[in-house]
Regions:
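Zn-dependent metallo-beta-lactamase
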Residues: 1-28, 32-37, 42, 203, ...
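Beta-strand-turn-beta hairpins that frame and shape the catalytic cleft
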Residues: 2-9, 21-27, 117-126, 157-163
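Pre-active-site segment of Zn-dependent metallo-hydrolases
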Residues: 3, 17-62, 66, 71-75, ...
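Active-site environment of divalent metal-dependent phosphoester hydrolases
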Residues: 15, 35-36, 66-72, 91-95, ...
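Active-site neighborhood of phospho(di)ester-bond hydrolases with catalytic His/Asp-centered motifs
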Residues: 29-31, 57-67, 85-88, 164-167, ...
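Active-site HxH/HxHxD metal-binding segment of metal-dependent hydrolases
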Residues: 47-118, 123-134
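Binuclear metal-ion centers of metallo-dependent hydrolases, dominated by the metallo-beta-lactamase
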Residues: 102-119, 176, 199, 203-246
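Active-site-proximal loop/helix segments of hydrolase catalytic cores
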Residues: 138-202
Length: 246
């Protein structure tokens, strides 16, 4: 499903993949993994269907961290002259999956650090903190699953709208300081903020629209999206679910 918001067309394509179109400019966030863009994802949950996606139309592709680095998916969404924005800490050499190196990606690769800004064809890109707190629920063996510095979130300024994808992160104090038009929170049951934290943040940010992503792709990401939508709507914040019915 494509959601029309202001001058944007927004589609959740599964897992953390989002396509954002404004006029002749197309951006993708964290494309791929788990068969969502190869047609191999065949889950029965409330989630976009897996498709053999090969548009190669993206002007901008943004990757938050190693867990969302999928070189095949980047090639499927990026045009030949795309700008591929990779967070500095992304390192294919330490990824225990079959991925190509950065030198084999299409287009121009730009490495971007924490709290940095970049502009591609008039679209502003800002990195934001994204991590799990050591004393929070998303730890393994006493260590955060996503330690500070491992990944980032992105705030895109596109067509006058400010689109916020927090990445794989708990709700952080820095998030509450943002001016956001379109909020794309994870609402999964592990690894990131859950639906309750995401709803609290949505109420505080008071965006024009909330579209949750990064849930129901596999068992550990299961979430009650209908309950999230009811919670957010009950707080007076517009929300849309971009998913196939279970």
């Amino acid at each position: 499903m494509t959601i029309r918001y202001d001058d944007l067309s927004v589609s959740w394509l599964g897992y953390a993949t989002v396509r954002i179109e404004h006029e002749d400019f197309i951006a993708y966030l964290d494309p791929g993994r788990y068969g969502t863009l190869t047609g191999d994802w065949d889950g029965e949950t409330a989630h976009p269907p897996g498709t053999d996606y090969d548009a190669r139309d993206g002007d901008l592709v943004c990757i938050t961290h190693d867990h969302h680095y999928d070189s095949d998916a980047i090639a499927r969404v990026a045009s030949d002259d795309a700008t591929i924005v990779l967070y500095d800490a992304v390192d294919p050499a330490r990824i225990d999956r079959d991925v190509d190196g950065i030198e084999d990606l299409p287009g121009e690769v730009v490495r971007i650090g924490a709290h940095e800004e970049y502009v591609v064809e008039g679209v502003g890109i800002e990195t934001l903190p994204a991590y799990n707190r050591p004393d929070g629920p998303n730890t393994s063996g006493g260590e955060p699953i996503h330690p500070e510095g491992f990944g980032c979130g992105y705030l895109l300024d596109i067509g006058g709208s400010r689109v916020f994808w927090p990445g794989d992160s708990d709700v952080l104090d820095a998030h509450y300081e943002l001016a956001v038009s379109l909020f794309l929170p994870s609402i999964s049951s592990s690894f990131t903020m859950d639906r309750h934290g995401a709803a609290d943040l949505a109420e505080s940010l008071d965006p024009d629209l909330v579209v949750p992503i990064h849930y129901n792709t596999f068992e550990a990401l299961e979430a009650d999206s209908a309950a999230f939508a009811a919670d957010v709507a009950g707080r007076g914040v517009p929300v849309i679910l971009d998913e196939r019915s279970s």
